Each structure stands twice: as C-alpha cells, then as structure tokens.
C-alpha cells in the first residue's frame, strides 16, 4: 500500500453513517471500527480519506444487510489540502466495499473518487469514472 504524501484530516468517527458508492448491494453503512487504529486512553477511533474501516450494512439488499464488511473511504466532506495549495471537499462521505486483499467487491463506482485513493488503491482508481 502506497503512502499518500499528505496529512488527511480524520473527519469520520465510529458510529458515522456513510453512503456506499458501489454496486455491491449496500446503500448505507455505519462505521464499527478502524483498521490499524491504536488509540490512547479511550480516544474515539477516527478515519479519513483512503482509510480502511469495518462497517455494518444498515440499508441495502436483504443478503447484504446486517453484515460486517471492510470498506475504503473514497470521499469526505471535510476539506483536504494538497501540496499545491488546492483545498478539496466533497458533497458527501462515501465508501467502497473491499475484500481482504483490499480489492473492490463491486464492479462499478458511482460519483467521483479522490486522487489520493486512486494512487493508494489502483483497482479502485481503474473502476472510477471521475478522479478528482
């Protein structure tokens, strides 16, 4: 997994409901835990762009509902600052469901994907229609 090269603000915490931007059958998911997070003294785990989380599917097809799956954050409302000085924010917080090898389970992604995510996860970048 490649490093991002920028410091992304961790704006999504556990318990947050996110939209699922792929065609796996999940529509709304809730963050349960953050992959690789080691906290300090009861600190709430947070995640940002291109981070992996374990999520619970709240709305979707009957075979996907109430399942725990892994997901990668591809959009976040909180603005990020690129080294060029550009500030980028999206309209919503969105994830893509991935498998254990961090490859997407769906076959298409709806909406734009941040360039930082496409660099870290090339398979997600190749499926995206718009990379911002």
Curated annotation (Swiss-Prot):
GO biological process, one term: translation
GO CC terms of this entry: cytosolic large ribosomal subunit
GO-annotated molecular function: large ribosomal subunit rRNA binding; structural constituent of ribosome
Domain of life: Archaea
A Pfam family assignment: Ribosomal_L14
PROSITE patterns on file: RIBOSOMAL_L14
Keyword tRNA-binding: no
Record keywords: Ribonucleoprotein, Ribosomal protein, RNA-binding, rRNA-binding
Functional note: Binds to 23S rRNA. Forms part of two intersubunit bridges in the 70S ribosome.
Family statement: Belongs to the universal ribosomal protein uL14 family.
Subunit structure comment from the entry: Part of the 50S ribosomal subunit. Forms a cluster with proteins L3 and L24e, part of which may contact the 16S rRNA in 2 intersubunit bridges.
Protein name: Large ribosomal subunit protein uL14
């Amino acid at each position: 997994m490649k490093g991002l090269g920028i410091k992304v603000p961790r704006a999504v915490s556990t318990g947050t409901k996110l939209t699922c931007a792929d065609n796996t059958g999940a529509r709304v998911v809730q963050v349960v835990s953050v992959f690789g997070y080691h906290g300090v003294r009861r600190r709430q785990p947070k995640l940002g762009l291109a981070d992996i989380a374990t999520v619970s599917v709240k709305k979707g097809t009957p075979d996907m509902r109430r399942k725990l799956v892994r997901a990668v954050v591809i959009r976040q409302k909180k603005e990020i600052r690129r080294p060029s000085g550009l500030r980028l924010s999206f309209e919503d917080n969105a994830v893509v469901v991935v498998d254990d090898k961090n490859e997407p389970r769906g076959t298409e992604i709806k909406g734009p994907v941040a360039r930082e995510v496409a660099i870290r996860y090339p398979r997600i970048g190749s499926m995206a229609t718009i990379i911002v």
